[in-house]
């Protein structure tokens, strides 16, 4: 077996018709978690439906359809392997909750793969001014996805024309630079997701293509295929050395055991014997045991979805959206207000002070008031454009002072990224996204259980 491969998460972005599904489907099909039986079943169905030219998008369409019908399909189907990594494809966009998922997301992407359609006219449509592509790329960058790979798809439709590829690289470099990425760190790979050129094996259709290269801290890295570009992602550092932050997804009451909060460790570690504080509830108690998939764990680390048993705390005292942390190491606290950089994505009107939509931040879902519009800024550079604007509208970015209508626990993005980004939901869609700059924390004394006092004496 050797050493376990590192896990990385990628998010696939691009225009609706760029061939995202086909390309992702191809990788999953060739290197991935779909077993032969499932594929044979799909192939048979495809043939019966006269889709005999069965291609990879079909795989993905099946998975998506099952997902949207609420059948939670085995997420292993969205995984594939490279020599170095286990790769999980996080919800590709197009899904209406994509933006919300990406922010509150079960997982932060380590790298974004931008798929551009190389076909005549298609490329231009994909990254035009109003393009969704721009929105998704900007989101990825704003939300801290610092690595990017660009795949120029459908190169077969332009007969593998070298000049076309170079023209697209030039345009796309400008595009990703405007978003905030440095094009020198981005591999550009010409592919055909349909035929498989340069996906896993180097293609023979483009003798002119010498391969991609990118600059990293440790020097230049080169390769030919999309799979190699994914394999060359810089390994993510998982924040185990930070203080514990664990947003609760649910709290269960289990007969004979007691209260069991469940959630995903975002930073730090949790283990039995620790004295933890829940914010904004203000409850401090001892962790009796930690488990994952019904097995006892010595410790839960970032990325683990754990359940843990706490003493002397009733189910009524803590709830989804609370955050658990180490009482002795920067314990989490509720907040009175926070300042955030907010980007308005699609709001039909104007947003002015007093607007109170619902914020989704980690697992919390709470109405917050836009208390003061402090300044309007340039989305890319962050430079101030206007002091105290009267309102902001779609496309604008602003620094806003936000006041939660109920107690909530958030953090500055620079300290704890997963607790410092949020989606603003209104009219059943994501109208804005934000990154928290600073937090005004509330200091209120809370309840310390007997178990916590006892543990403290040890």
Swiss-Prot record:
Signal peptide: none annotated. This is Elongation factor 1-alpha 2. The modification N6,N6,N6-trimethyllysine is found at residue 79. Residues 153-156 are annotated as: G4. Keywords: Cytoplasm, Elongation factor, GTP-binding, Methylation, Nucleotide-binding, Protein biosynthesis. Residues 14-21 are annotated as: G1. GO terms for cellular component: cell surface; cytoplasm; fungal-type cell wall; hyphal cell wall; yeast-form cell wall. The modification N6,N6-dimethyllysine is found at residues 3, 316. The modification N,N,N-trimethylglycine is found at residue 2. Residues 5-240 form the tr-type G domain. GO terms for biological process: biological process involved in interaction with host; translation; translational elongation. Residues 192-194 are annotated as: G5. Belongs to the TRAFAC class translation factor GTPase superfamily. Classic translation factor GTPase family. EF-Tu/EF-1A subfamily. GTP binds at residues 14-21, 91-95, 153-156. It holds the Pfam family GTP_EFTU_D2. GO terms for molecular function: GTP binding; GTPase activity; translation elongation factor activity. NCBIfam families: EF-1_alpha, PRK12317.1. The modification N6-methyllysine is found at residues 3, 30, 316, 390. It is found in: Cytoplasm. InterPro entries: EFTu-like_2, G_TR_CS, GTP-eEF1A_C, P-loop_NTPase, T_Tr_GTP-bd_dom, TRAFAC_GTPase_members, Transl_B-barrel_sf, Transl_elong_EF1A/Init_IF2_C. It comes from Candida albicans (strain SC5314 / ATCC MYA-2876).
């Amino acid at each position: 077996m050797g050493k376990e491969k590192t896990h990385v998460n990628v998010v696939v972005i691009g225009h609706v018709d760029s061939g995202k599904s086909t390309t992702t489907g191809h990788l999953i099909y060739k290197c991935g978690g779909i077993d032969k039986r499932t594929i044979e079943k799909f192939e048979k169905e495809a043939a019966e439906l006269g889709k005999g030219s069965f291609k990879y998008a079909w795989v993905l369409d099946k998975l998506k359809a099952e997902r949207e019908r609420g059948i939670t399909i085995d997420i292993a189907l969205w995984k594939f392997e490279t020599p170095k990594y286990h790769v999980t494809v996080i919800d590709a966009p197009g899904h209406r909750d994509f933006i919300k998922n990406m922010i509150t997301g079960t997982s932060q992407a380590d790298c974004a793969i931008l798929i551009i359609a190389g076909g005549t006219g298609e490329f231009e449509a994909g990254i035009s001014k109003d393009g969704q592509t721009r929105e998704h790329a900007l989101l990825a960058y704003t939300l801290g996805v610092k690595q990017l790979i660009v795949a120029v798809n459908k190169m077969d439709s332009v007969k593998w024309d070298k000049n076309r590829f170079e023209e697209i690289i030039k345009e796309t470099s400008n595009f990703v630079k405007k978003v905030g990425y440095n094009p020198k760190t981005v591999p550009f790979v010409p592919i055909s997701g349909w035929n498989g050129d340069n996906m896993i094996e180097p293609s023979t259709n483009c003798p002119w293509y010498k391969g991609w290269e990118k600059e990293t801290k440790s020097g230049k890295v080169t390769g030919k295929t999309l799979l190699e570009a994914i394999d060359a992602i810089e390994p993510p550092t998982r924040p185990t050395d930070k203080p514990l932050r664990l947003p609760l997804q649910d709290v269960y009451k289990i007969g004979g055991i007691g209260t069991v909060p469940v959630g995903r460790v975002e930073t730090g570690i949790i283990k039995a014997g620790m004295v933890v504080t829940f914010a904004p509830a203000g409850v401090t108690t001892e962790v009796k045991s930690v488990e994952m998939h019904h097995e006892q764990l010595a410790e839960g680390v970032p990325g683990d979805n754990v359940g843990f048993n706490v003493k002397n705390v009733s189910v009524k005292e803590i709830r989804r959206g609370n955050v658990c942390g180490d009482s002795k190491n920067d314990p989490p606290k509720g907040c009175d207000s926070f300042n955030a950089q907010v980007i308005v994505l699609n709001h039909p009107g104007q947003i002015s002070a007093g607007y109170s939509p619902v914020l989704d931040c980690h697992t919390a879902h709470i109405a917050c008031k836009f208390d003061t519009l402090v300044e309007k800024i340039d989305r890319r550079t962050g430079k101030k454009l206007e002091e105290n604007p009267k309102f902001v509208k779609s496309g604008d970015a602003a620094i806003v002072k936000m006041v939660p209508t109920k107690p909530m626990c958030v953090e500055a993005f620079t300290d704890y990224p997963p607790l410092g980004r949020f989606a603003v939901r209104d009219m059943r869609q994501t109208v804005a996204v934000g990154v928290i700059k600073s937090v005004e924390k509330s200091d209120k004394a809370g309840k310390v259980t007997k178990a916590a006092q006892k543990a403290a004496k040890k």
